């Protein structure tokens, strides 16, 4: 189904965005900001 494909794409995008956000947060914390 088309909605399943869209959902999978959204999930992938959300996952990458989450990883990027976590990475940025970790960098900020490690710098003591």
Curated annotation (Swiss-Prot):
Expressed by the parotoid glands. The modification Alanine amide is found at residue 33. Keywords: Amidation, Amphibian defense peptide, Antibiotic, Antimicrobial, Secreted. The keyword Transcription regulation does not apply. It comes from the Eukaryota. InterPro entries: Dermaseptin_dom (IPR022731). One of its GO terms (cellular component) is extracellular region. It is found in: Secreted. The keyword Secreted applies. Disulfide bonds: none annotated. GO terms for biological process: defense response to bacterium. Belongs to the frog skin active peptide (FSAP) family. Dermaseptin subfamily. Possesses a potent antimicrobial activity against bacteria, fungi and protozoa. Probably acts by disturbing membrane functions with its amphipathic structure. This is Dermaseptin DS VIII-like peptide. The lineage of its organism: Eukaryota, Metazoa, Chordata, Craniata, Vertebrata.
């Amino acid at each position: 189904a088309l909605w399943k494909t869209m959902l999978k794409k959204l999930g992938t995008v959300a996952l990458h965005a989450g990883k990027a956000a976590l990475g940025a947060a970790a960098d900020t914390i490690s710098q003591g900001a």
